[in-house]
Swiss-Prot record:
GO terms for biological process: fatty acid biosynthetic process; malonyl-CoA biosynthetic process. This is Acetyl-coenzyme A carboxylase carboxyl transferase subunit beta, chloroplastic. Its EC number is 2.1.3.15. Pfam families: Carboxyl_trans (PF01039).
Length: 491
């Protein structure tokens, strides 16, 4: 059962009634009360909206006695948008800012039939009244040119965003041409403001991706005031509703780009619930070389990242079960000082490998790092050799199974050591994987690095790793790999 929420207000004399329309794929059921006074005329079971059939027609004859031409715009709430993307698909978008609700219904059949029914009702009501323009609620843009209608749409949406949500800055583009806007309908019951803003351009198709709200080219970040509601894709700049973003595994719903995940989110993704047992979680750095910066002392910087992320270091290690198979896993977190590898990170990963060696467990290390931590000097570089030595004993002497998962970004010392030592090396789609960054190479060698030459897809063709696996398939793929190598569930 799919539901389209239209928190609309119907006027009938002095009474107001709030409704919820519940819709299945085949029919639109009776209109039911959610609040308001009982009205026997509206509550009668015979006052139903008939089924939506293949012909696309709908009979409103049973309810026309309480709907007037002035009320048809109240059928859709002020917070509901009807839009069409560049492919011609129709969507309804519902906002409830107060309750932080954002819902999208993309069943084009329902929207098209709804639009058709409303248009038919408007035509019939206008004929009964004798003139379309006799009503003061008649929208002058309804039968105007497409250009004027598009301008009106942009004006309404711009006014809604700026006044209803109180956005301080414009969501704007640099053009006054709205001919490429795919927003085709916006139904509201407020009077049209005389001030039409021509500085906003809200597009539902940018570079082949639908429902992107494009801001100024020099300001791609979302307004800080609403970052608790939205996550902006760093690839297509589309907005993802935060409430659903985590359930989608931090994958952009517009372009499929894999955005960064925290180490805790990755543990939740890979480890069976209730089986996670962390190792060495209280190990912290003691500033071994007493590194001090004019901007911020190293210890103070460590403390600030600990408060920001809730982690003690840039890696979490522990044991758990993946589809019932006991494993040892280390997950690096780029949010903690760029996932840089210091003495504590190296020690925790080494201890994890040694524990797995003694317990004969398969090992997974999820890499997300900018490389060695410069604040610890040569001690951070030593971790590369220390981890590689532990892996040598684990893989060659004990003949156990190690899987390296490379996420974006994986660079520097991590790439040069345990990141590329896996028996199976898996990369995420679009992951940035390199030893030296693009700018470092260009400034050092004075040569241009081609775009995409450090992306997972290009490196896969060059044989740098074995698989590119999307997040939603990763756990299943790992489970099959472990069983193929002789590791089976406990039960």
């Amino acid at each position: 059962m799919e539901k389209l929420w239209l928190n609309s207000m119907f006027s009938n004399g002095k009474l107001e009634h709030k409704y919820r329309l519940s819709r299945s794929m085949d029919s639109l059921g009776p209109i039911r009360y959610s609040s308001g006074s009982e009205d026997p005329v509206l509550n009668a079971m015979d006052n139903k909206v008939s089924s939506w059939n293949d012909s696309g027609s709908c009979n409103f004859s049973n309810v026309e006695h309480f709907l007037d031409i002035i009320d048809i715009w109240s059928f859709i709430s002020d917070d509901t948008f009807l839009v069409r993307d560049s492919n011609g698909d129709s969507f309804s978008i519902y906002f409830d800012i107060e309750n932080q609700i954002f819902e999208i219904d993309n069943d084009s059949t329902f929207i098209n039939e709804l639009e058709s029914s409303f248009s038919s009702y408007l035509d019939s009501s206008s004929m009964n009244s004798g003139s379309k323009k006799s009503s003061r609620y008649y929208y002058r843009y309804m039968y105007d040119t497409q250009s004027s209608w598009n301008n009106h749409i942009n004006s309404c949406i711009d006014s809604y965003l700026r006044y209803e949500i109180s956005i301080d800055s414009y969501i704007s583009g640099e053009t006054h041409n709205y001919s490429d806007n795919y927003v085709y309908n916006f139904i509201c019951n407020e009077s049209i403001s005389g001030n039409e803003s021509r500085n906003s351009a809200i597009r539902t198709s940018v570079n082949g991706s639908d429902f992107n709200i494009r801001g100024r080219s020099n300001d791609l970040d979302i307004n800080k005031k609403y970052r608790h509601l939205w996550v902006q894709c760093e690839n297509c700049y589309g907005l993802n509703y935060k409430q659903f973003f985590r359930s989608r595994l931090n994958i952009c719903e517009h372009c499929g780009y894999h955005l960064k995940m925290s180490s805790s989110e990755r543990i939740e993704l890979l480890i069976d619930p209730g089986t996670w047992d962390p190792l060495d979680e209280n190990m912290v750095s003691t500033d071994p070389i007493e590194f001090h910066s004019e901007e911020e002392p190293y210890r103070d910087r460590i403390d600030s990242y600990q408060k920001k992320t809730g982690l003690t270091e840039a890696v979490q290690t522990g044991i758990g079960e993946l589809n019932g198979i006991p494993i040892a896993i280390g997950v690096m977190d780029f949010q903690f000082m760029g996932g840089s590898m210091g003495s504590v990170v190296g020690e925790k990963i080494t201890r994890l490998i040694e524990y797995a060696t003694n317990k004969s467990l398969p090992v997974i290390i999820v890499c997300a790092s900018g490389g060695a931590r410069m604040q610890e000097g040569s001690l951070s570089l030593m971790q590369m050799a220390k981890i590689s030595s532990a892996l040598y004993n684990y893989q060659l002497n004990k003949k156990l199974f190690y899987v390296a998962i490379l996420t974006s970004p994986t660079t520097g010392g991590v790439t040069a050591s345990f990141g590329m030592l896996g028996d199976i090396i898996i990369a995420e789609p679009n992951a940035y994987i390199a030893f030296a960054g693009k700018r470092v190479i260009e400034q050092t060698l004075n040569k241009t690095v081609p775009d995409g030459s450090q992306a997972a897809e290009y490196l896969f063709q060059k044989g740098l790793f074995d698989l590119i696996v999307p997040r939603n398939l990763l756990k299943g793929v790992l489970g099959e790999l472990f069983q193929l190598h002789g590791f089976f569930p406990l039960t």
